Every structure is written in structure tokens, then in C-alpha cells.
Amino acid sequence: IHTYPQCRIFLFGGGEKETEVMNRWADTWPEVCNASAQLKGLQQELILMSHLQVMVTMDSANMHLASLVHTPVVSIWGATHPYAGFMGWNQNPTNAVQVDLPCRPCSIYGNKPCMRGDMACMNQIKPEDIIQRIETVLKQK
């Protein structure tokens, strides 16, 4: 956040616990907005997504929604794999952040427990790799 003070960060989605965390982040950093608490309905979310320079998301509905409004997506993949056919429509595969492990994908839909017990597919993803992909997308704008 401090490296890019001109950037605004909008947080989407989440259940009750996630919403509490997103509210705390929005209260802590003025550059962060909990969009899920501010917007009323899918149409408003799509409008906001269509104005983003980049959407950072896991393999989720938000990845697909951002894709539908032509927003570049940096997607984070753990148990699932984009080659299973769930990559966002018209998205650049190089923006899929993931680690290659012999146990991946362990679930087509991401709903099975980790067979290794260590969630290496997520824990081995470095924040720096995600930031690098974001910076690459922003430089292309």
C-alpha cells in the first residue's frame, strides 16, 4: 500500500468472518474500501469491476465476473488448476499465480482436504510473485 500510494484497493465478497477482517482493513488503511459493504447488488459490483485496472482474486466467481467486464485478472490457484477449464474468460494464462506440485490439482472444485496436510499449494505462493504479476499488468495499461 505504501509503495503505491495512488492505488485504491477494493475488497469484494466474503462471509461474516471475512467481512469483519475487510472492515478492519478498510478502517486501518484509507486506500482500502470494503466494496462488499458499500455496494448494493451484483450490478454495482460489475460496474466497479469494469473500472478496475486489475482484479486480484482466487479461482472464484469474482475472477469470472471481472473477466466478463474485460478487467485483467491476476488469479491465485491452490488446489485447483486453470487447465481443468476454470480459467477466467479471455484471461492471460501467465497471470495465473500457482506453484507446480505433483499433487495438483487435488480437487477439480477445490472442495477436498489437502492430502499432504500442509496446503503447500497455497503456502508456497510468495506474496512477491503476486505483486510482480500485478505490476506487470499495470505496466501494460
Language-model features: where?
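Nucleotide-sugar donor-binding patch of glycosyltransferase catalytic domains
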Residues: 27-28, 34-35, 67-140
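Donor-binding and catalytic core of enzymes assembling or modifying cell-surface/extracellular glycoconjugates
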Residues: 1-79
